[in-house]
């Protein structure tokens, strides 16, 4: 249960007063006149703690109560946030998650009282801050059954991935010059691998099945005597596929190859035991687990020891692997977010699975839709639902859904109009890849929001398809594959 009651609206778009949210949403506006609707705004009833959606924002109705134990009122800050305008429903948690109010409450004291440099060992200000940093390090390690000394703080998962994929091969470059990864990794992994190719390393990019999973036999065949590192992500950021980490770790350990996994989308969301799974390096991101942005971590195994060249050098902080003064507010927030992920795991799992099932079934009831991912529940993270809507471009649908915050792929590449390389790797053609939308469900998503999204998607897909000549031909029974387009 929430120990601190934090009622807030505005940018978070939620009122947290208990484990349950009561949400009232408007019906989607008819799309015959315009495919886009006014974005709904969330405001709260201070008496009931219920969350309501209305348009436009009425700041006079916003009621903010600071969390218990907080010495600062956040009322003004939230009112300022509401001035940014109406807030759409947020279903893009793979890109980032809202900061949990309890995490924010934990961070505030480091801006007002505990402001010492954790590396200052000559006075109490440094000692008390260092104590809190180590406490956070322990919380983060506990989630993956690691030793706190194996947690190295970084600026985020991108830096951590660079640190692992560049640092390990560089340290062992005299004897080992081969790296293995997959075609569906995050861009920062693929770009780091290509960078190592420029340095003279050979890289093998493993293919995946139509459901996004690697073939373990392909991995076994790809490993060579000079293979230094295997980097395979735990949960894909676009389609939510879970790779068989335990089996991969076993193969790597048997062949004396280091195993790195990008767990930015998996940490705290699926069970991970670095010892049982033989994981040597693991990337973590705070802002994917309802923590602050700008902080992450790299798990680096101590026994058997993993050696790597540091990317950032200087003062020798973080065991000499990542120099630079730590930011105690971010570290403390990260630690609290990790503690809550472990504490709330059973609730989050039930909540997300329930809403995911409802959303997936509702979307796939629309004609000519396709789920992108794995149909085996054991290999699919339910919080990520990627669906292709045939005969519609994903960008067009996103423009028609201004009242819902969604993505057509990775947030790091969403500005590009190129079709998803992840879906291409699954065998999807350009048209299908272009028509995909990623829906993300998280801790603060409500059932009422999912109901609203299903209805809105149904109406606007129908509206856009009525403007598509291809859809009209399909409705008339014409097989598009039989048409010789070059002759028209």
From Swiss-Prot:
Active site: 412 (cysteine persulfide intermediate)
Up-regulation conditions: Expression is up-regulated at high-iron conditions.
InterPro entries: Aminotrans_V_dom, Aminotrans_V_PyrdxlP_BS, Cys_deSase_IscS, PyrdxlP-dep_Trfase, PyrdxlP-dep_Trfase_major, PyrdxlP-dep_Trfase_small
Localization (cell): Mitochondrion
Enzyme's top EC category: transferase
Keywords: Iron, Iron-sulfur, Metal-binding, Mitochondrion, Pyridoxal phosphate, Transferase, Transit peptide, tRNA processing
PTM sites of type N6-(pyridoxal phosphate)lysine: 288
Binding positions for [2Fe-2S] cluster per the UniProt entry: 412
Chain residues that bind pyridoxal 5'-phosphate: 157-158, 237, 265, 285-287, 325
PROSITE patterns hit by this protein: AA_TRANSFER_CLASS_5 (PS00595)
GO terms under biological process: [2Fe-2S] cluster assembly; intracellular iron ion homeostasis; iron-sulfur cluster assembly; mitochondrial tRNA thio-modification; tRNA wobble position uridine thiolation
Keyword check for Iron-sulfur: yes
Family (UniProt): Belongs to the class-V pyridoxal-phosphate-dependent aminotransferase family. NifS/IscS subfamily.
General function of this protein: Catalyzes the removal of elemental sulfur from cysteine to produce alanine. It supplies the inorganic sulfur for iron-sulfur (Fe-S) clusters. Plays a role in both tRNA-processing and mitochondrial metabolism. Involved in the 2-thio-modification of both 5-carboxymethylaminomethyl-2-thiouridine in mitochondrial tRNAs and 5-methoxycarbonylmethyl-2-thiouridine (mcm5s2U) in cytoplasmic tRNAs.
Protein name: Cysteine desulfurase, mitochondrial
Species assigned in the record: Candida albicans (strain SC5314 / ATCC MYA-2876)
């Amino acid at each position: 249960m929430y120990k601190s009651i934090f009622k807030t609206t505005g940018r978070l778009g939620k009122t947290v007063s208990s484990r349950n949210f009561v949400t009232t949403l408007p019906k989607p506006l008819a799309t015959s006149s315009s495919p886009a609707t006014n974005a709904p705004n969330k405001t709260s009833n201070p008496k009931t703690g219920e969350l309501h959606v209305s348009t436009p924002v009425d700041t006079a109705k916003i009621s903010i109560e600071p969390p218990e134990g907080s010495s600062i009122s956040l009322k003004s800050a939230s009112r300022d946030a509401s001035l940014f305008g109406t807030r759409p429903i947020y279903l893009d948690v793979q890109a980032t998650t809202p900061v949990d109010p309890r995490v924010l409450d934990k961070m505030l004291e480091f801006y007002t009282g505990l402001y010492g440099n954790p590396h200052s060992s000559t006075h109490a200000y440094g000692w008390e801050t260092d104590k809190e940093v180590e406490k956070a390090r322990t919380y983060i390690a506990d989630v993956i059954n690691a030793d706190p000394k194996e947690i190295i703080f970084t600026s985020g998962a991108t830096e951590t991935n660079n640190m692992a994929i560049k640092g390990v091969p560089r340290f062992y470059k005299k004897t080992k010059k081969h790296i293995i990864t997959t075609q569906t990794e995050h861009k920062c992994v693929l770009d780091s691998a290509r960078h190592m190719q420029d340095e003279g390393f050979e890289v093998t990019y493993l293919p995946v099945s139509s459901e996004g999973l690697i073939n373990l036999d392909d991995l076994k065949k790809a490993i060579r005597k000079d293979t230094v590192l295997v980097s395979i992500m735990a949960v894909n950021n676009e389609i939510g596929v879970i790779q068989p980490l335990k089996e991969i770790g076993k193969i790597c350990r048997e062949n004396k190859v280091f195993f790195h996994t990008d767990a930015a989308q998996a940490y705290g969301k699926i069970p991970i035991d670095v010892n049982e799974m033989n994981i040597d390096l693991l990337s973590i991101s705070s802002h994917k687990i309802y923590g602050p942005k700008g902080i992450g971590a790299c798990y680096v195994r101590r026994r058997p020891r993993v050696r790597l060249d540091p990317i950032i050098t200087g003062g020798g902080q973080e065991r000499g692997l990542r120099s630079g003064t730590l930011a105690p507010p971010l570290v403390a927030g990260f630690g609290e977010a990790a503690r809550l992920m472990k504490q709330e795991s059973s609730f989050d799992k039930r909540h997300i699975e329930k809403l995911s099932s409802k959303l997936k079934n509702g979307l796939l009831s629309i004609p000519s839709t396709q789920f992108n991912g794995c149909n085996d529940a054991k290999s699919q993270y339910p919080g990520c639902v990627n669906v292709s809507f045939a005969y519609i471009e994903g960008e067009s649908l996103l423009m028609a859904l201004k009242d819902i915050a969604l993505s057509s792929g990775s947030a790091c590449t969403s500005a590009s109009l190129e079709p998803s390389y992840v879906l291409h790797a699954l065998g999807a053609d350009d048209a299908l890849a272009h028509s995909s939308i990623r829906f993300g469900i998280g801790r603060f998503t409500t059932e009422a929001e999912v109901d609203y999204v299903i209805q809105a998607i149904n109406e606007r897909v129908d509206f856009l398809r009525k403007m598509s000549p291809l859809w009209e031909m399909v409705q008339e029974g014409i097989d598009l594959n039989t048409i010789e387009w070059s002759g028209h």
